[in-house]
């Protein structure tokens, strides 16, 4: 009798977008009032995008660009929420179970600490697994420190049964 082995897989990813004055700020699947959002083909949610990329990386399924592309009209201004939901559906269809994800936003704004638990809850429900959210600044160094953009770094763990 062949007993299946559970093989954990780890993925890592980054995302960065330039701040776009006047655009709605979506970060960690939350709308941040009175904050400028990030440019992009999508809603500019670097936190959600980094988690999607880390999940795809862990499963060996490419990256966000290969997942949705930038030329597909149905993904114009797509939300991070939709990307996380569709990524979860893809992974589950390929036999993967999401273990957890961790993501750190790098930038001056929005101030993630005030809504960190809310972000973890929303994103965790979308992927069906715990999500840890944190944030840091770069002490005024680089494009994130000057407020020109926001970045995020994420890791994710998934499992797939192997015979």
Swiss-Prot record:
A divalent metal cation binds at residues 15, 17, 49. PROSITE patterns: ISPF. Pfam families: YgbB. Its EC number is 4.6.1.12. GO terms for biological process: isopentenyl diphosphate biosynthetic process, methylerythritol 4-phosphate pathway; terpenoid biosynthetic process. 4-CDP-2-C-methyl-D-erythritol 2-phosphate binds at residues 15-17, 41-42, 63-65, 136-139, 143, 146. It catalyses: 4-CDP-2-C-methyl-D-erythritol 2-phosphate = 2-C-methyl-D-erythritol 2,4-cyclic diphosphate + CMP. GO terms for molecular function: 2-C-methyl-D-erythritol 2,4-cyclodiphosphate synthase activity; metal ion binding. The record marks 41, 137 as: Transition state stabilizer. Belongs to the IspF family. Homotrimer. This is 2-C-methyl-D-erythritol 2,4-cyclodiphosphate synthase.
């Amino acid at each position: 009798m062949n007993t299946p082995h559970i093989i954990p897989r780890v993925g890592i990813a980054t995302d960065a977008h330039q701040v776009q004055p006047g655009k709605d700020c979506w970060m960690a699947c939350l709308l941040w009032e009175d904050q400028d959002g990030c440019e992009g083909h999508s809603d500019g949610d670097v936190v959600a995008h980094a988690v999607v990329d880390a999940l795809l990386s862990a499963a060996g399924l490419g990256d966000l660009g290969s997942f949705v592309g930038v030329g597909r009209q149905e993904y114009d201004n797509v939300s991070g929420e939709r990307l996380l939901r569709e990524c979860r559906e893809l992974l589950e269809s390929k036999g993967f179970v999401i273990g957890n994800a961790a993501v750190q936003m790098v930038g001056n704004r929005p101030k993630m600490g005030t809504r960190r638990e809310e972000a973890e809850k929303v994103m965790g429900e979308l992927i069906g697994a715990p999500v840890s959210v944190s944030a840091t600044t770069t002490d005024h160094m680089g494009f994130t420190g000057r407020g020109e953009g926001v970045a995020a770094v994420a890791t994710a763990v998934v499992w797939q049964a192997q015979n």
